[in-house]
């Protein structure tokens, strides 16, 4: 199994890079993980709803074009299914047993396009809270690492 994180946005603040890199390095012994940073559509100051929809469509096309044919697409969005860490660990164990490669899509500041939502095998919510997409990167990689540590009896998860 391989995990690819398809994320909109290429210039992250230093605190995001620091937090993400820590867990990204930790997860590698458990599962091959890759991050694909895709360009965010250029936004204006007073964008209309039509403009925002267009930006989401452009970003959605980037996500779908980056998707490999054998990958299961999972859309991260506030309206998705919530999982406990233990349920995520079970889900990841199943992916590994089935040999599934997984692509996790993180949208830009305006979310994911309808095309990405429709293409996704399922939708996952890290929280009912709305979060900035740079923070989602850190939360996602930490939860993936935590789930893998459960599956490998590593002492990181102590809940």
Swiss-Prot record:
It comes from Acinetobacter baumannii (strain ATCC 17978 / DSM 105126 / CIP 53.77 / LMG 1025 / NCDC KC755 / 5377). It holds the Pfam family SPOUT_MTase. This is Ribosomal RNA large subunit methyltransferase H. It is found in: Cytoplasm. CDD domains: RlmH-like (cd18081). The lineage of its organism: Bacteria, Pseudomonadati, Pseudomonadota, Gammaproteobacteria, Moraxellales. Belongs to the RNA methyltransferase RlmH family. S-adenosyl-L-methionine binds at residues 76, 107, 126-131. GO terms for cellular component: cytoplasm.
């Amino acid at each position: 199994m391989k995990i690819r994180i398809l994320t909109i946005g290429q210039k992250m603040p230093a605190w995001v890079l620091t937090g993400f890199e820590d867990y990204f390095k930790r997860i590698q012994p458990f599962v091959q993980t890759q991050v694909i940073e895709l360009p965010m559509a250029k936004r204006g100051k007073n964008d209309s709803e039509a403009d925002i929809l267009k930006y989401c469509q452009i970003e959605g096309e980037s996500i779908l074009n980056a998707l490999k044919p054998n990958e299961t697409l999972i859309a991260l969005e506030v309206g998705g299914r919530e999982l406990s860490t233990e349920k995520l660990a079970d889900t990841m164990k199943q992916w590994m047993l089935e040999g599934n490669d997984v692509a996790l899509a993180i949208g830009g500041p305006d979310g994911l396009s309808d095309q990405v939502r429709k293409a996704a095998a399922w939708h996952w919510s890290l929280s009912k809270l709305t979060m900035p997409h740079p923070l989602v990167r850190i939360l996602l990689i930490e939860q993936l690492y935590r789930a893998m540590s459960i599956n490998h009896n590593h002492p990181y998860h102590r809940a």
